[in-house]
């Protein structure tokens, strides 16, 4: 559906991207065989199906390690305690939609098989890759893209580097760059001779530590309610994980997007498509309005669904 001459929104039916191998849930038998430590966290839900406690960060971490190893051949993935633990199905969804934006089919025409990095024509920048490095890892493992992950936290980059050390093919195609300026996005990361086909970003969406804690407790409460249990404030307030730069920044998601969009204009000739996740629906239109004001030649708004949760990707470019 076209909203204007240079922008369009793609409405998606409920569910993950058609390329997403996680559309049919998790094969816990295969996952625990691949990563035995997962066994201790598997239990039955009220209807007798295998699941884990998604409010337990250790359980989610073990599930992620198993998923990445089993489906994507990414070995020994881990994150430090307290780091953001990403939901793999949602993260690979973003990559699939970006691949579609770029016109990239899955290598060999197969759905979500682990591939050697042979599609080096595409280069992706992950702004704020975090300690999990998930977008660069998945983009390289599935599509064979060359990737650069940037972050303001040297410890986060050190963790991604340790993961890459156990994955030689990924290590050869993913590089990491420290952003020395916490208020910059592309400056000092994109070098004079760089060209990226696309940039991706998952902004911190809270404006303060207090807001981040309240958001996490809301998630815990909702999970507890779905299990017919009471959530108490005595439970870890950041059980879902996430360090300062990963969860919140001054001004929250809206100001983060505003700054990134403004800075993107200076790198219009070095990035084919700028993209970002937008978690809060009320932040979408202000971002798109600013993008158009800055003279973007094409603007996209992509809606993604993971269960009952709707997220959005905005994409823009300044050249045909």
UniProtKB/Swiss-Prot annotation:
* InterPro entries assigned: METTL16/RlmF, rRNA_lsu_MeTfrase_F, SAM-dependent_MTases_sf
Q: What class of enzyme is it?
A: transferase
Can you say where in the cell this protein is located?
Answer: Cytoplasm
Chain segments carrying region Disordered: 1-20
GO BP terms in the entry:
rRNA base methylation
Which terms are listed as keywords in the entry? Answer: Cytoplasm, Methyltransferase, rRNA processing, S-adenosyl-L-methionine, Transferase
Q: Which GO terms describe its cellular component?
A: cytoplasm
Give the enzyme's EC designation. Answer: 2.1.1.181
Cite the GO molecular-function annotations of the record.
Answer: 23S rRNA (adenine(1618)-N(6))-methyltransferase activity
List the catalytic activities from the record. adenosine(1618) in 23S rRNA + S-adenosyl-L-methionine = N(6)-methyladenosine(1618) in 23S rRNA + S-adenosyl-L-homocysteine + H(+)
Q: Which PANTHER family match?
A: RNA N6-ADENOSINE-METHYLTRANSFERASE METTL16 (PTHR13393:SF0), SAM-DEPENDENT METHYLTRANSFERASE (PTHR13393)
Protein task: Specifically methylates the adenine in position 1618 of 23S rRNA.
NCBIfam families membership? PRK11727.1
User: Into which family does the record put it?
Assistant: Belongs to the methyltransferase superfamily. METTL16/RlmF family.
Can you name this protein? Ribosomal RNA large subunit methyltransferase F
Organism from which the protein derives = Saccharophagus degradans (strain 2-40 / ATCC 43961 / DSM 17024)
